[in-house]
Each structure stands twice: as structure tokens, then as C-alpha cells.
């Protein structure tokens, strides 16, 4: 690499952030000396090369969808036919244990085990979400016109809603708040949260369920959880609507459930596109890309830049940060 070509980049930012510039220069120097393969697949857009990348990304997602939907369709049909026996069978196979209700005391203990600063942040977020959605609330109204005419609308919350909350190595307490609190504001009668059982269930997620006012938490995940909520099985009742994100299997199950129950949306793998010129901070850009890449092996994290030096700097910074994250194996697959 011709280091002289990046000298203007270093010089014009020197007064603003010498530390970042020195760090960037060390990355460029390391790359020049070691000539290591870039963490990111860097493609020069020429009208053809980028189209090949886009086709590859689409094909990867489409191929996975086809295989997954076939598996999910079989599980959904089996649960519909055999009910609770099928749910338990799949839960023991994929979750490692039969479904169970998480007792209120477990939620209380999880709440008390969390850092008080985290609890304060969750409660503040809950209050903000509640206040915002109260302003959006569609209300019942009636208009009495002349000659006995009465027009209007009646708005009622659904009787029962199921909330899917992802498990695994990542904790998503925000997902609990953003799904449960608007439902409470809307007047939903009963909230049932399902989340995969783990050896140590996330205290943050369980605390968020307590703060949001979730009525019942059930330890079950994956397609079998969506199937149980869709058709009702054992102590898991049928719901009117299923909301919340999940992996590709959960998304496919929600797609098949739609029509029997309502759903919020079919959420595909996470995608992010970051546009950054030479002035962008590689540390921040890398963090933005990784925040989506770590969600799923089929996630897509794409960077657009007009600076090859910047592309290489961000690639190196992504690799440095990624190796510090617990979902390193997933990130390697997604990028």
C-alpha cells in the first residue's frame, strides 16, 4: 500500500483526533507489512462486481429459507395434529427440556439480581415507551347525528397475545419492553411470553418481563413455541396474535401461523448498510456493522465507502472487535 496516498487523510484530522489517526496509521502499516486477508470481503464497484455480491447474498438467504420452511411446515402440522405430545417431543429435542412455566418468584429473583443501574434504565425506558404509545392510542368514539343516526367505532384490545423473545447467548430485554408495553396500553387482556430455556435464563429478560407486566412466562423456544401459541397445546393456550423477533425458524413459523392467528410481521435476517466516507471513525462504523452481523449467520452487514483505505481500516477494526464478542462464530459466518 502506498502510505503517501493516505497522508492527507491523517494530516487533515490530526488536530481533531490524534489518537484515532495514530491508530488508523498503525492499521494501515500492519496491513502493508503483513498483507493479511481482509476480514471483510472488499469489492470495487464497477457495475458488475457488486451485482455478483448482491446475487450471492440473495441466493444465500433464499436457499436457507426454502430448507427451513420445509422443516417448519412439518413441525407445525405435527403439533396441530398431535398437540401437547408433539410440543414436548420437539421441546426436548431442540430446547433440551420440556416446556415449563417460569414462576413469579423467579422473575422477582432475577429483578433483584440485576444491577440497580440496569433496573433504573429499564424502568425509565418502560415509562418512555408507555407514555409514547398512550399518545398513539386509538380510542372508542361515538357521534350522534340528527334523526337518531349514531356513527362511531369501538376499539378493544385483543384477549390474548403471545410474545416471542429470543434466547441464546444474547439478551434482548428491549424486545420484551417494546412488545409487551404497547400491548398493555392497547388493553390486551393477557400477555404470554415464550423464550428458550437455558441453563441460566437471562436475568435482564426476566426482569424486563416483570417491569412490563407480562402475565405468564413459559420456557419454550423455536418453531414448537410458535406452533403451541398458534394451535394451543397443554398449558399453553391459543393466542390471538404472535409478536416478537426470532431466528429464521421462528420467522418461518410465524409466516405459516398467519391466518390462524395474527402476527406483527415476518422479520427476516438482520441487515444493515452503512455509508461512510474518509472522515468516519472506523471504530464506530465497525461497531454498527457488528451489532447486526452478530444476530444471525444469515445477517448482512454492508459498508459503502469511496475510500479503499477506510474500507481496510474498518475491516481490521471489525475483526479486532469481533474477536472480543461472545458471538464470534456467528459473526464469521455472516460477514
Language-model features, listed with the residues they occupy:
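Short, basic, low-complexity termini and linkers enriched in Ser/Thr/Gly/Pro
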Residues: 1-11, 15, 20-32, 37
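Short, well-ordered beta-strand elements within core beta-sheets of diverse protein domains
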Residues: 74-78, 272-277, 303, 335
Amino acid at each position: 500500500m502506498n502510505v503517501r496516498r493516505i497522508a492527507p487523510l491523517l494530516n487533515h484530522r490530526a488536530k481533531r483526533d490524534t489518537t484515532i489517526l495514530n491508530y488508523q496509521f498503525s492499521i494501515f502499516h500492519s496491513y502493508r507489512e503483513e498483507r493479511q486477508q481482509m476480514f471483510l470481503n472488499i469489492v470495487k464497484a464497477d457495475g458488475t462486481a457488486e451485482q455478483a455480491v448482491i446475487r450471492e447474498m440473495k441466493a444465500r438467504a433464499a436457499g436457507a429459507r426454502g430448507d427451513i420452511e420445509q422443516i417448519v411446515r412439518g413441525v407445525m402440522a405435527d403439533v396441530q395434529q398431535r398437540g401437547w405430545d408433539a410440543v414436548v417431543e420437539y421441546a426436548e429435542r431442540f430446547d433440551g427440556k420440556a416446556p415449563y412455566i417460569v414462576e413469579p418468584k423467579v422473575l422477582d429473583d432475577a429483578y433483584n439480581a440485576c444491577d440497580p443501574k440496569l433496573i433504573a434504565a429499564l424502568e425509565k425506558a418502560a415509562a418512555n415507551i408507555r407514555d409514547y404509545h398512550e399518545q398513539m392510542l386509538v380510542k372508542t368514539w361515538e357521534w350522534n347525528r340528527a334523526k337518531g343516526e349514531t356513527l362511531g367505532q369501538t376499539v378493544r384490545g385483543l384477549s390474548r397475545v403471545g410474545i416471542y423473545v429470543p434466547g441464546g447467548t444474547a439478551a434482548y430485554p428491549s424486545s420484551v419492553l417494546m412488545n409487551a408495553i404497547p400491548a398493555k396500553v392497547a388493553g390486551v387482556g393477557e400477555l404470554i411470553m415464550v423464550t428458550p430455556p437455558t441453563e441460566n435464563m437471562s436475568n435482564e429478560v426476566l426482569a424486563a418481563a416483570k417491569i412490563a407486566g407480562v402475565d405468564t412466562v413459559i420456557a419454550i423456544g423455536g418453531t414448537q413455541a410458535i406452533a403451541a401459541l398458534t394451535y394451543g397445546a397443554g398449558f399453553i393456550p391459543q393466542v390471538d396474535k404472535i409478536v416478537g423477533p426470532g431466528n429464521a425458524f421462528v420467522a418461518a413459523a410465524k409466516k405459516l401461523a398467519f391466518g390462524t392467528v395474527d402476527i406483527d410481521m415476518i422479520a427476516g435476517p438482520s441487515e444493515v448498510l452503512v455509508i461512510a466516507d474518509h472522515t468516519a471513525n472506523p471504530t464506530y462504523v465497525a461497531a454498527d456493522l457488528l451489532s447486526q452481523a452478530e444476530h444471525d449467520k444469515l445477517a448482512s452487514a454492508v459498508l459503502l465507502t469511496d475510500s479503499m483505505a477506510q474500507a481496510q481500516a474498518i475491516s481490521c477494526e471489525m475483526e479486532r472487535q469481533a474477536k472480543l464478542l461472545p458471538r464470534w462464530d456467528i459473526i464469521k459466518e455472516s460477514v
